[in-house]
Amino acid sequence: MPLKEDDCCLFAEEYDGPPLSYNIPCAVPINVEKIPVAAVVSPVCISDNMSFPVIQPILSVESKKFLIDSVSPTSVIANCGSNQLELVSDSITVSPTSVIEHTEEEEEEEGGDGEDCELSSSGELLLRSCSVKESLDLNESSSNPLVPDWESNESVLSMDYPSSRVTGDCVSETNGDGKKQPVVTFLGIASDDGFEEEESCSNLRRVRVVPVKKQPQTKGKKGSCYRCFKGSRFTEKEVCLVCDAKYCNSCVLRAMGSMPEGRKCVTCIGFPIDESKRGSLGKCSRMLKRLLNDLEVKQIMKTERFCEANQLPAEYVYVNGQPLYPEELVTLQTCSNPPKKLKPGDYWYDKVSGLWGKEGEKPYQIISPHLNVGGPISPEASNGNTQVFINGREITKVELRMLQLAGVQCAGNPHFWVNEDGSYQEEGQKNTKGYIWGKAGTKLLCAVLSLPVPSKSTANASGEQLYSANSRSILDHLEHRTLQKILLVGNSGSGTSTIFKQAKILYKDVPFLEDERENIKVIIQTNVYGYLGMLLEGRERFEEEALALRNTKQCVLENIPADEGDAKSNDKTVTMYSIGPRLKAFSDWLLKTMAAGNLGVIFPAASREYAPLVEELWRDAAIQATYKRRSELGLLPSVASYFLERAIDVLTPDYEPSDLDILYAEGVTSSSGLACLDFSFPQTASEENLDPSDHHDSLLRYQLIRVPSRGLGENCKWIDMFEDVGMVVFVVSMSDYDQVSEDGTNKMLLTKKLFESIITHPIFENMDFLLILNKYDLLEEKVERVPLARCEWFQDFNPVVSRHRGSNNGNPTLGQLAFHFMAVKFKRFYSSLTGKKLFVSSSKSLDPNSVDSSLKLAMEILKWSEERTNICMSEYSMYSTEPSSFSN
């Protein structure tokens, strides 16, 4: 209708024409109460040069299809077509100093992560938006801004709004797709120094971390081994704790190596374990018990339980809606009463009473109170609906039932304040009304209702933090996680066993326990009977040689045939190596027992019975004559003379081996298995006077691992287990240069071959090597009699020796020259194969000072290697990462 000047109203007429090809604009009524407004800034705070930042609206994807003009916030015209424009949520605040938060419900529904953006107009603004599937690209939206009509808001802006934040009531309203509108957060104008910006960024919520299972690198048919692809589902296998790979009996040691973090593949070392297998940590399988000895199994299981990589990741545990930091998890696990069977998940924790439970469930344990972990407890933490609160948490019906039966007055929906000792009072009052768990009947009631009661450790903690045995073990393991491992290897007879025992005596307060000494006593006494048997075998040989020599001389002197001479000399069969009938019978019986392999079964149990015969045998002149020629008995070891000279005392029932006896004893350490020793070097007098901060080196822990030579042979079955050792100590017996093995090969050449196989193995490529040339005292004695050129590798040893040799006049001895020659030989051989430097030390394994010096040299090498790595890292961080910044 045409508008007349005197009309005060407008009327619309009904359209009855042809159908329209476009959408008809609709008039949307305005709810004035829901129009977002902002308070007028005080004129005092406004300067002439100050301009306000402009909020750029974020539109949906559908709205990008239309070209939209600037629309006033109070406009009533909206497009009501199929692609309807959706206004930003009514809860948006347009004040430059306000904060518009994106609620947790919207984030969880959209499933997006927060993204920080920065807008700058005249002042700096921090914009945090939620990246949802249907959000508009920020760059595109900023290029087509929708500038709001600020003039149309003048009618509603007033000084009647004292607050700078006005929020509508439609936060939970959804859009046409049933999804909530994304809300933008403005964190205000940053200060000049940027402090507010940094503080706001640091307060952003942490992203929830979801455990992701690592997949195995290879996988065969179902039920087969993941390495050799053999076997079936019925074949016994060992399972990796990380990727679930399964290995058979033949492949488990090669696939898992030395297991520095337990039963993990070598490629899985450093990864967290599968949480479904946490219950099997430290529980050894039958397969490992068959493959390894008890000491190795115990060490692997201990490492598996307490190593840092296998501990529960802190970010997987949520307490009162917040993920834990590593320090908080350690605090939680090391308290006097920690949560039992802690697994990844959401938990609630009442810090006042110590009540602990899973999110949305009733409490199942009372842990130590007042722990600074997680956030504040939520009223809906246990999903209660009783209108009764304990320390700000609405309790469940089961808890309410327990309180009512315990005599607590719960009428009127009270709010209780409960302490760790069970005392309770209403909020706002000081009078204690009673103790919830004070009666024995209440504890029985809690047991029936499956509710927790305070433990004795919680009641007696008195604010002091105590440590459980398991938590203490975790801390101890984390404290010593920098354990330096030293691998001790050498050929058979090189002296690795003696060095290992010497280290045990030097660095352990109690090197051998009582039962160990009793077992060593049996070994020593059995060895002495074996040495006597070797002497008796040599006596028979010497006796036969003496008789043959006598007959030959007699036949030559009398000029008669040898056969007739033997017949005439039957009565003259007594030589200096002959023994009486009684000792002869004992000798024959002992040799038969040795040949049958029953020496360890009969002796030393029968020592008391045969002690008189042994004493008589040792004092016999024939045995003494044989003992003087002991160097001609190839099977008799050099340490035999130490025990044979004390045979009468050693074979007594009340014999107790000394530390020196144990050092000389053979067979004390296993020749077929690993032997480990954890130790630390004691502080010297000079170190005790140093500053306490300089004691770090002496307090470091080391692990000496002795490996048998047969395990490092051609197949090298043990080498793959030692990829985490710090260095390798290779021991060489210098007195073996003239010895030969059973197949006739020189022992020094066999040692060289073993040394080559180890230094060229890829496992030891980046490790330092210390060569200990052992038995220096035996070398000095032997080299005077047997030339070093007896070994074909040392045929070029031609020293210039002075007539007046000796250490007194400053000239090196022949033994010193031989040692230096061997050291140079091994150094050149090592350098030719690896291109690196070999550290060399001489040693007398029976001398404690000599062994101590060699092992301390190993410590210094490890220390220097660590410092060298730190220096390289510091240089790397100081200079640019460009290739031109480095020089070769």
Swiss-Prot record:
This is Extra-large guanine nucleotide-binding protein 1. CDD domains: G-alpha. Keywords: Calcium, GTP-binding, Metal-binding, Nucleotide-binding, Nucleus, Transducer, Zinc, Zinc-finger. Residues 843-848 are annotated as: G5 motif. Residues 702-711 are annotated as: G3 motif. Its cofactor is Ca(2+). Belongs to the G-alpha family. XLG subfamily. Residues 661-669 are annotated as: G2 motif. Residues 103-118 have a biased composition (Acidic residues). One of its GO terms (cellular component) is nucleus. It comes from Arabidopsis thaliana. Its main location: nucleus.
